[in-house]
Amino acid sequence: MGTTIGIIGLFVAIALLVVLAFKGHSVIIAAPIAALIAVLFSYGLKGHFMASYTITYMSGFANYAKNYFPIYLFGAVFAKLMDISGNAQSIAQFCTLKLGKSRAVLSVVLTCAILTYGGVSLFVVAFVMLPVAIAVFRAADIPKRLIPGAIALGAFTFTMTALPGSPQVQNTIPMTYFGTDSWAAPVLGIIATVIMFGGGMAWLSYRTNKAKKAGEGYGNYQDEIVSDNKEVPGIGLAFAPILIILVVNLVLSKMVYPNVDGSYLEESFNSTLAANSGTWSVLLGMLVAILFIAAVNFSKLKDGLKDNLKKAANESLAPLINSCAVVGFGSVTKSLAIFGIIQAFALGISSNALLSEVLSINILCGMTASASGGLGAALEALA
């Protein structure tokens, strides 16, 4: 009976966290409340609530921040410079211009994919692409309601998790646990990319054609965001920072770090080169790209550089802290006795180790209600 109540309580806590997040409540507040509800259902009034919050919850919170704050910070600075330099807008305009209005959905998807694969934050890509997507969809007379799907397919799927070399945090989180780099399992990654991209485009094309047959067009909207027509750099200059990240990341992770003596990490830092080299490769790639953008656009950036760097640093905190909050929730759920039961069930779903890992991580990510935060919590539990 106690186990059943505990499992019910865990799902109640997850549901509460999801509902509060969808309602616009702060995850930073909702996550610990949901975690303590799970503790209450599992242990009753003997749940040691303060210890669960200040020790278990905050340990998961702090560990995630320690491991991934540099990636969030560098990513935010890179994204900010790509935005204010006009590079992101230049890439978006180039892709949509070359593919044309008849391939509006494909142009938006590919542009988002290029930007996210180059290291631009998912959130920034959504904001940068919205005005461009609006202009393209309006010209092609495609329903506006399909814009979120097109942006999500390009930014939040294969370039976020599957395409080899992606610097997005969801692709870099596993490096710490598996001792790999961001280029790990390239064949599987490419296969997954083809499935995600192909399936997503097939669905979006189906919905577009269905809307056209029904006579549904873009529609009329007031006070709409429109694409900024400011002067932007040439496509070669705009795309260079993305190539820099990819090349530096690849060279360091495949050629440099494998030949470096990392024994000092074990002796002085209680760590290993394998656990850190992947993250370092991504960070250094972003750093070189940031310096390149700043140098090339110095005259354009110098006046507001201090303020923009400050904004970028501040903007890196919100997604990081939200993910930390959810990882803290995952740390509490992992400490519950019922979590072991659910974990054993998840791991025993299939005798195939790879399939079992895929299914179990999906289940545990669902339990922790976050992509990056849930992935970190799931890998921590399965490590």
Feature-to-residue mapping (PLM):
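N-terminal alpha-helical transmembrane segments of multi-pass membrane transport
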Residues: 1-75, 80-92, 96-99, 201-222, ...
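Long, contiguous bundles of hydrophobic transmembrane helices that form the permeation core
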Residues: 3-5, 10, 187-308
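Hydrophobic core segments of alpha-helical transmembrane domains in multi-pass membrane transport
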Residues: 9-21, 32-41, 72-77, 111-116, ...
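Short helix-coil transition sites and intra-membrane helix breaks within transmembrane domains
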Residues: 23-27, 65-68, 79-89, 116-128, ...
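Core transmembrane alpha-helical segments of multi-pass membrane transporters/permeases
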Residues: 54-89, 274-340
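Short amphipathic alpha-helical coupling elements at transmembrane boundaries
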Residues: 59, 90-100, 134-139, 307-315, ...
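Hydrophobic alpha-helical transmembrane segments of multi-pass integral membrane proteins
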Residues: 69-75, 98-134, 320-331, 342, ...
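Alpha-helical transmembrane segments and, especially, the helix-loop junctions at the ends
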Residues: 112-129, 139-189, 193-206, 364-377
